[in-house]
């Protein structure tokens, strides 16, 4: 009886199996390369810290300038409350820019670590997957920067009030030139923002990274579908539950009581999840087609 020949891809992959120690060595190598890429990107970004801070402060400055033109606020400004705060904020800004700048290297190193466990036909997806991952991550950050942050700071600055008046009873009822009168003093004060560099950068960077990570959802579910862990039908049946989960996650993950950010994240998650179903359909179709082609080759070799 003739035994069916092993698929060439499986033979090659069996030869490439690594012991656990080699997996650890490979992980250290990929982490080292990612960290080196991030350090170089951070140093380059720090050289442009001034323009970068002006860029990241633009959503706040635009909202503040509009309120200032309407007479509700003084000209925009930011303060720092400790000697090292400005330096630390600019360094963290350079690090954040370095993450986006080095994201092609980081995603490529991640793929290089995962790829030894994949067949050759799946490895051919490396470059498209890296490109799409980078575009989704950067696209999520841009979505937050263009649509979420301006509305967020317009909403927060709306709590300011240039002339909030109160009446304080200072002396009470007194006799003045033979007459009983109520002596009161009306005081007026303003509620104005005094935003520190650290607080602004903390909220802004959190939203940028959060939306960047959320936009990776189609890639994550697409890879799970390619590995056979999830199916398009299962994802579609879970859709109505995911919509609820998406808006709850938006309320939990978005900092503060930022309603605009919560709705934007919930809506973005819902759209991305449905896009992921389409990606899973394509991945499943490609996998079935490749399996059918491999089976045909195996049958041909067995004859």
Regions from the PLM with identified roles:
Residues 1-303:
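Membrane topogenic/interface segments and analogous intrinsically disordered interaction regions
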